[in-house]
Swiss-Prot record:
This is Small ribosomal subunit protein bS20. One of its GO terms (cellular component) is cytosol. It holds the Pfam family Ribosomal_S20p. Binds directly to 16S ribosomal RNA.
Length: 88
């Protein structure tokens, strides 16, 4: 338990930040699920549209520190590679 005023304030801040981060991570997962669903349906056009919507979200979360920048880049790269494979 926090004993000082500073520690109590930090605990409050951490709780609020954790909730915000969880919400934003959930949003990222939702966008990625839409891309994955389009890929599973082998629908190139839908997958491309979903990917174009997911990329800025991934970039924003990487900038905010919700996701590591390398993880965001890796996910974008793998999704793009999979989508390009739908044409082959």
């Amino acid at each position: 338990m926090a004993n000082t005023a500073q520690a109590r304030k930090r605990a409050r801040q951490n709780t609020k930040r954790r909730q915000n981060s969880a919400s934003q991570r959930s949003m990222v997962r939702t966008y990625l699920k839409r891309v994955d669903a389009a890929i599973a349906a082998k629908d190139y056009d839908a997958a491309t549209e979903a990917y174009k919507k997911a990329v800025p979200v991934l970039d924003r979360m990487a900038d905010k520190g919700i996701l590591h920048k390398n993880k965001a880049a890796r996910r974008k790269s793998r999704l793009n590679k999979t989508i390009k494979g739908l044409l082959a």
